[in-house]
Amino acid sequence: MPKNVTVIGAGLAGSEATWQLAKRGIHVDLYEMRPQKETPAHETGEFAELVCTNSMRSNQLSNAVGLLKEEMRHLDSLIMKAADKTQVPAGGALAVDRDSFSKYVTDTLRGLDNVTVHEEEITEIPEDGITIIATGPLTSDALAEQIQKFSGTDSLHFFDAAAPIVAADSIDMNIVYKKSRYDRGEAAYLNCPMNKEQYENFTRELIKAETAQLHGFEKNDVFEGCMPIEVMAARGAKTMLFGPLKPVGLEDPHTGETPYAVVQLRQDNAAASMYNIVGFQTHLKYGEQKRVFSMIPGLENARFVRYGKMHRNTYMASPDVLTASYEAKKRPGLFFAGQMTGVEGYVESAGSGLVAGVNAAREALGEEPIAFPKDTALGSMANYVTTTSAKHFPPMNASLHFYLLGK
């Protein structure tokens, strides 16, 4: 008779781990503190809520995260099932209707006979039994303190941010145009063209804009892949032109020319009634977001459905704590998964949950845990978070560099 497994946290990693356990016949007690206790970033009590972008990045197999997605599809990933079923147009990327995505994951797990959902906060690490802790970078203070004591190391952190979302019917379609970069795939993005003067005025006001106060925030304490747009602008007058405002491959059909800069909008829901401003993660005050982002051509009268915001993400010094199966070195049967382990990104978090779920299931069935091969996307990611120097351990997206190191 297989043992029961406790999963703490129903984010991307915890949801994926629960699915991998349940499909192997294991009974799971799944604990999620939302909606009874909220976090600074979540807005619902749904499982696998996407708190930042609605994009899961590239779908191309030549890209590390595209390869990771495909491995997960072959391993019957719930998160990939949900993403594929709820995707919205995004060119060569995989973007989803965030509400439909979370609902699919929630309904699937709540519908399983061998999953019992508990809407309550866990404040201590269970002393016995097989457990997966996947409470994410916004782990409650009480449990975060217990995890820090268990790991015996100081927790690490970085700051993450979300981009604003605007209502589609408030976008000036006489100015913006629909196109994907280099015309790859379908025309999936709305593009707001800027001339040099507009770009320079926008940059100047963006740098001057007032930011919200966030305890402990430092400009050098952000994840490079999710940098606030105002921090990027302050790095140099043309920095944004090589980032989210890059105009190459986005010729304006109205003029036949490539604009000086382009702000892209990506569909955020299946009804195409909302669009997020791509790459515009921010911690400007809400009034300043309205003032400055309304300078973008086509968004002069934009109605903001959600303003951007920033939050602190905490993670462990995993190389000192975990094995490549995401199991604690000093306590067999205790696993960790998700961004709290040092992986960064939606797909990476879910991937770590998949590996932890598979190994917790093996433990419950009396089998030995396994380390995925280092020359796979899943295995190379686990190898990174468990063998890198703990003193120099930044959070990391899937990377072909780590994949190739395993070959």
UniProtKB/Swiss-Prot annotation:
Q: What is its EC number?
A: 2.1.1.74
* Catalysed reaction equations from the record: uridine(54) in tRNA + (6R)-5,10-methylene-5,6,7,8-tetrahydrofolate + NADH + H(+) = 5-methyluridine(54) in tRNA + (6S)-5,6,7,8-tetrahydrofolate + NAD(+); uridine(54) in tRNA + (6R)-5,10-methylene-5,6,7,8-tetrahydrofolate + NADPH + H(+) = 5-methyluridine(54) in tRNA + (6S)-5,6,7,8-tetrahydrofolate + NADP(+)
Read off the PROSITE patterns from this record: GIDA_2
Q: Where in the cell is it found?
A: Cytoplasm
Per its UniProt record, what Pfam families does this chain match? Answer: GIDA (PF01134)
Q: Which residues form a coiled coil?
A: none
Annotated GO MF terms = flavin adenine dinucleotide binding; tRNA (uracil(54)-C5)-methyltransferase activity, 5,10-methylenetetrahydrofolate-dependent
Q: Its domain of life?
A: Bacteria
Q: A GO biological process this protein is involved in?
A: tRNA wobble uridine modification
Record-listed FAD binding positions: 9-14
Q: Does the keyword NADP apply?
A: yes
State the NCBIfam families in the record.
Answer: gid_trmFO, PRK05335.1
Sequence similarity = Belongs to the MnmG family. TrmFO subfamily.
Q: Which HAMAP family match?
A: TrmFO
Q: What is this protein called?
A: Methylenetetrahydrofolate--tRNA-(uracil-5-)-methyltransferase TrmFO
Question: Which source organism does the UniProt entry give?
Answer: Lactobacillus helveticus (strain DPC 4571)
Q: What is the lineage of its organism?
A: Bacteria, Bacillati, Bacillota, Bacilli, Lactobacillales
